[in-house]
């Protein structure tokens, strides 16, 4: 809209996630996990990027533990194990989206030859599932989550969904 920009990013198993490389951003673990960015001016997140906790990216359901992540080169990115990520919009004021989220490494898909740093495990990225729905109704965003399941309850770190991450 003329008043704001809203991005909701998700990737089913039919898509590759956002790549990461050692010379660029090798902490691209969560941008396709329903990352939800709200912007009025375009620079809202610029000042906090150095201290950004990728496990608390806006809209993302993730296990706490940024300090336990090892940076990787991942040319396929991360996506969901499930084939459902959908959205529709009227081009103006209304949109809806839904996602079945259970993270997988893109290099684990069949017939992939560019494995990147697949040997780096980063186990805290995996082991939970969530069903998420989004509805944009004019100036309102309704975000719903259901069935958030911790499949590895013995693993350190709570599962949380972050609404926003700001400098203040």
Identify what each model region corresponds to.
Residues 1-168:
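Catalytic and substrate-binding regions of extracellular carbohydrate-active enzymes
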């Amino acid at each position: 809209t003329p008043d704001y920009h809203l991005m909701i990013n998700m990737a089913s198993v039919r898509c590759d996630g956002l790549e990461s490389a050692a010379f660029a951003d090798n902490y691209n673990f969560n941008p396709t996990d329903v990352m939800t960015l709200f912007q009025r001016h375009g620079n809202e997140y610029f000042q906090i990027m150095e201290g950004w906790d990728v496990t608390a990216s806006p809209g993302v359901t993730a296990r706490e533990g940024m300090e336990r992540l090892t940076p990787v080169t991942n040319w396929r990115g991360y996506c969901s194990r499930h084939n459902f990520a959908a959205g529709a919009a009227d081009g103006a004021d209304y949109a809806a989206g839904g996602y079945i989220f259970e993270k997988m490494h893109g290099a684990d898909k069949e017939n992939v030859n560019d494995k990147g740093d697949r040997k780096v495990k980063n186990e805290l990225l995996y082991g939970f599932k969530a069903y998420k729905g989004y509805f944009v109704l004019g100036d309102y965003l309704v975000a719903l989550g259901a069935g958030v399941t911790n499949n590895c309850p013995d693993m350190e770190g709570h599962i949380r969904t972050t609404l926003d991450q700001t400098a203040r």
